[in-house]
């Protein structure tokens, strides 16, 4: 399997198996106070990097919330025919605080899963509350990703290297955690293995003919 195929397959798997499991706030840098009408969307998955706003795919509203699937390093064991790749997922979220309409009130509904459905609270009485607790969105997102990764030895036709640990944490600079409030970022790294795409050299091909 080629490097390009691996990155594309993992990105598609992340989009389906991780991003579809959670909805997070859609950023609005022009209105991140009480004027912001809260909107939740599924994060998007991108290969290698997160595109700028003017380069978003048609079905994606904003660069964040998102996951970028990056290749950190790789190695090919030609003798054993094994390719090993270190993959990093870069998770990004946005949350400046609690907005009107964000709180959901449980209402009994026998037809709903668990016996309850949810509806917005009283938005007239709610007020915007700027907080520093938006980091919780990032770690909820991260926990979902870890749960999906740790539950699958084989995903996207690629095998997780179970002998290598899954590592994760916040992004740091000079030992200090990034602080770009109200944006929150973290990473997850893991190792995958697959077969090395084998191509006979011209010299070998001539000998075999």
Where are the regions that the model predicts?
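Small/polar-rich, solvent-exposed N-terminal microdomains that initiate assembly or binding
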Residues: 1-80, 203-209
């Amino acid at each position: 399997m080629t490097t390009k195929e691996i990155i594309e397959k993992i990105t598609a798997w992340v989009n389906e198996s991780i991003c579809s499991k959670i909805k997070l706030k859609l950023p609005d840098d022009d209105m991140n106070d009480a004027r912001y009408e809260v909107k939740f969307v599924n994060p998007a998955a991108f290969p290698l990097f997160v595109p700028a706003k003017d380069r978003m795919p048609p079905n994606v509203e904003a660069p964040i919330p998102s996951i970028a699937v990056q290749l950190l390093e790789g190695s090919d064991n030609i003798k054993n025919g094994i390719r090993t790749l270190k993959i990093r997922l870069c998770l990004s979220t946005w949350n400046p605080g609690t907005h009107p309409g964000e709180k959901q009130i449980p209402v009994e509904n026998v037809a709903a899963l668990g016996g309850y459905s949810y509806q917005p609270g009283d938005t007239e009485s709610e007020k915007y509350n700027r907080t520093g607790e938006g980091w919780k969105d990032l770690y909820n997102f991260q926990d979902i990703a870890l749960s999906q990764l740790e539950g699958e030895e084989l995903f996207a036709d690629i095998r997780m290297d179970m002998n290598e640990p899954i590592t994760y944490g916040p992004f740091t600079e000079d030992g200090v955690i990034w602080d770009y409030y109200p944006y929150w970022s973290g990473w997850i790294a893991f190792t995958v293995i697959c077969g090395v795409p084998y191509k006979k050299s011209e010299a070998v091909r001539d000998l075999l003919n």
